[in-house]
Amino acid sequence: MRGPLCFTLIAIAVTSVVAHTTVYGVWINGVFQGDGRDVYIRSPPNNDPVKDITSSAMACNVNNSPVGTTLSVAGGDRFTFEWYHDNRDDDIIAASHLGPIAVYIAPTTSNGAGTVWTKIFEDVYNGTWATTRLISAHGQHTVVIPEVPAGDYLLRAEIAALHEAYSLYSQVPSKGTQFYISCAQIRVTSESASGSELSANTAFPGTYTDSTPGILWNVYDQDPTEYVAPGPDVWSGAPGGSISQVGSA
């Protein structure tokens, strides 16, 4: 006969299977750009997280290879990532996977290697976690394209799920913060205003370490208002962004 503990373990196992997420496509100024998987998104082969923060997969996940399409944008455009689990506009990510969302930018010529990334958006907790609001927004969150020099860039969206962040992956490989990462290829066609060079102060891997604030965190016991997301502050030249639905599937 199965007892309560057995059913609890089954529930945990099921949650771990159905919880994962990746980016399906993007919207530019409210217009959907079509299924972006392996088209303009450097899509991973599955929706599993990256947990080893020393891995090169921290840049653009495990399939960081150029794809055939680059999306044209201009400074000030609203660029919306749309995440999904198995099918577009499904459960997006498990409700238990609480954590922040960030977006970084780097020149495509770098392929994401080295200290080339600049954080241009971050949402952590404002009464509810960013991931909770992402589910309500049908997987959509927006970043405003900054006024940067014209050229090709990678836009890196990152979800850090903290439900197992009470242990470090380096010490307990079955646990650790789960990073869901996806990179889109963009071409900025507008010229920058003066003084808008990116800060380029972040490396993946490199910047996130076991001692970085936000990597080790007990989401069940600690005050969410005290949580500090990993990485630097958002770049001062970033115009902002939001977590809200811009369109329907």
Curated annotation (Swiss-Prot):
The free-text cofactor remark is:
Binds 1 copper ion per subunit.
One Pfam family here: AA9
Q: Which cofactors are reported in the record for this sequence?
A: Cu(2+)
UniProt subcellular location: Secreted
In the UniProt record, the signal sequence range is 1-19
Residues given in the record as Cu(2+) binding sites: H20, H97, Y180
Biotechnological applications: Lignocellulose is the most abundant polymeric composite on Earth and is a recalcitrant but promising renewable substrate for industrial biotechnology applications. Together with cellobiose dehydrogenases (CDHs) an enzymatic system capable of oxidative cellulose cleavage is formed, which increases the efficiency of cellulases and put LPMOs at focus of biofuel research.
The intrachain disulfides are C60-C183
Its Enzyme Commission number(s) read 1.14.99.56
The processes (GO biological process) annotated in the record are:
cellulose catabolic process
What GO terms are given for molecular function?
metal ion binding; monooxygenase activity
User: Which InterPro entries does this entry report, sorted A to Z?
Assistant: AA9, AA9_LPMO
Q: Does the keyword Oxidoreductase apply?
A: yes
Instruction: List the protein's name.
Output: AA9 family lytic polysaccharide monooxygenase A
Q: Which gene encodes it?
A: AA9A
